[in-house]
């Protein structure tokens, strides 16, 4: 929280996004409270990152954390969310970044018919869009 305030004060031309950090729901709630006490209304922010999610995203606890802040009106961004996370709580997030599609294409040597690039589709926009569609419609 202090870093965000410093960055916004010294580099106001950059659209810095606050990030909630924690391990358990109570930790994230404390972080949310610290932002509020510093005058940062997270519900008014265009995007709020949710940290410490990757590698734990298939747990019910992460789902509860996402749902808590989604219900509070926060526009959430998930860092490093894998397909399980997209399927479980992606509908509650404004944006997600993920390398899961790229890792899967590389590991499984996936190559879509008709692709003109060399090698598997791990850097292929077409495959990324196919992966996204499959992940969002399951």
Feature map (PLM): residue ranges:
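Conserved alpha/beta-domain cores
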Residues: 1-72
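Alpha/beta catalytic cores of nucleotide-metabolism and tRNA/nucleoside-modifying enzymes
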Residues: 9, 37, 64-76, 83-138
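Glycine-rich beta-strand-to-loop/alpha-helix junction loops that act as flexible
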Residues: 50-53, 79-83
């Amino acid at each position: 929280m202090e870093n965000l305030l410093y960055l916004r004060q010294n580099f106001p031309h950059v659209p810095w996004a606050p990030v909630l950090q924690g391990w358990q729901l109570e930790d994230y709630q404390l972080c949310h409270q610290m932002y509020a006490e510093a005058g940062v209304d997270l519900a008014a922010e265009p995007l709020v990152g949710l940290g410490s999610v990757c590698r734990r995203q298939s747990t019910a606890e992460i789902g509860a954390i996402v749902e808590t802040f989604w219900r509070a009106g926060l526009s959430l961004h998930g860092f490093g969310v894998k397909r399980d996370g997209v399927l479980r709580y992606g509908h509650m997030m404004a944006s997600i970044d993920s390398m899961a599609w790229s890792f899967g294409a590389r590991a499984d040597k996936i190559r879509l018919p008709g692709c003109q690039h060399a090698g598997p589709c791990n850097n292929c926009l077409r495959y990324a869009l196919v992966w996204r569609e499959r992940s969002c419609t399951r």
